[in-house]
């Protein structure tokens, strides 16, 4: 018996351009996820992408309007490419309208250089922009009238009102600088493309940074985004590799079966639960799952199977 584990679901805000995109599925999936007991629904963020890709904060606002209690979150918002004061207003509004359900996941991306060019932000500035932005964002959320005269932000007397409910900030990343930033500035970590051993090592580095920042006694969430293919057949792993882990072909993942077994969830419900337990054993407290197969009908079949065969054991802590 383990403690109950929270599990969220990535909304179908993106998918291959050769498929017909059904925008209505974002709202209906959010409603369904709330009804079956997912802890949160999440949306990814890109402004230039090879696939269909709906904007994250707009999609989450739509999902919030269709639900009442489920958490809503960005996994992850590319804050460094956006104007900070606008993001503060957008996210504070969303947190208020959703009665405090927003979890703000933030990352620096970089896998699609064209979108940074389109945003007018040099790739090399991503980390520095985030380091400057986060303390300012916290102060605005707290109701302060903020003055800034930094390298990337220059404004005076900027505040958000009404003051929003608390907005937990989760940061993504696994590079050394990212882990240091997470320990210093975040309420939680959203890991991705990492093995259980890697998750444990990164968690230890984050804790060391939290210790240095005097934050070790504060609440801290350890989350992980995992792509899954729930399939009992022997061909499941091969199929998942053929689908490129659930990412566009343009993203060169050098995917092979051995790599996939380490970094994704593939197989029967028991296989997936056993793998999830390995992450729980090294400190993971919340999962965000996303089907590898993004074709709309397949996506729906996959999340329904996950909700029926995997989610109940996570929620009740009865994996072992």
Report each predicted region and the residues it spans.
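Conserved, mostly hydrophobic/aromatic
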Residues: 33, 37, 63, 94, ...
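Glycine-rich, proline-tolerant flexible connector loops at the mouths of alpha/beta enzymes
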Residues: 40-66, 78, 110, 193-197, ...
């Amino acid at each position: 018996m383990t403690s109950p584990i929270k599990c969220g679901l990535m909304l179908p805000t993106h998918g291959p351009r050769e498929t017909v995109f059904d925008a209505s599925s974002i709202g209906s999936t959010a409603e369904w996820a709330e009804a079956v007991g997912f802890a949160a629904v999440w949306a990814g963020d890109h402004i230039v992408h090879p696939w269909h890709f709906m904007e994250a904060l707009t999609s989450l606002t739509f999902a919030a309007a269709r639900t009442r209690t489920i958490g809503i979150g960005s996994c992850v918002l590319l804050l460094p490419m956006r104007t900070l004061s606008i993001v503060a207003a957008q996210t504070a509004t969303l947190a208020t309208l959703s009665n405090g359900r927003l979890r703000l996941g933030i990352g620096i991306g970089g896998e699609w250089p064209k979108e940074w060019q389109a945003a007018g932000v040099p790739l090399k500035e991503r980390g520095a922009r985030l380091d400057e932005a986060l303390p300012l964002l916290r102060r605005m959320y707290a109701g302060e009238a903020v003055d800034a005269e930094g390298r990337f932000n220059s404004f005076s007397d900027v505040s958000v009102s009404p003051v929003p409910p608390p907005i937990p900030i989760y940061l993504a990343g696994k590079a050394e600088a990212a882990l240091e930033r997470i320990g210093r500035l975040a309420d939680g970590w959203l890991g991705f493309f990492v093995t259980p051993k890697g998750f444990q090592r990164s968690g230890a580095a984050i804790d060391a940074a939290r210790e240095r920042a005097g934050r070790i006694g504060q609440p801290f969430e350890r989350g992980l985004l995992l792509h899954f293919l729930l399939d009992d057949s022997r061909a499941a792993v091969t199929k998942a590799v053929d689908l490129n882990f659930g990412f566009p072909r343009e993203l060169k993942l050098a995917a092979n079966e051995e790599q996939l077994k380490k970094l994704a969830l593939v197989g029967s419900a028991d296989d997936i639960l056993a793998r999830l337990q390995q992450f729980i054993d090294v400190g993971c407290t919340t999962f965000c799952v996303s089907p590898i197969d993004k074709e709309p009908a397949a996506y729906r079949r996959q999340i329904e199977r996950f909700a029926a065969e995997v989610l109940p054991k996570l929620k009740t802590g009865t994996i072992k």
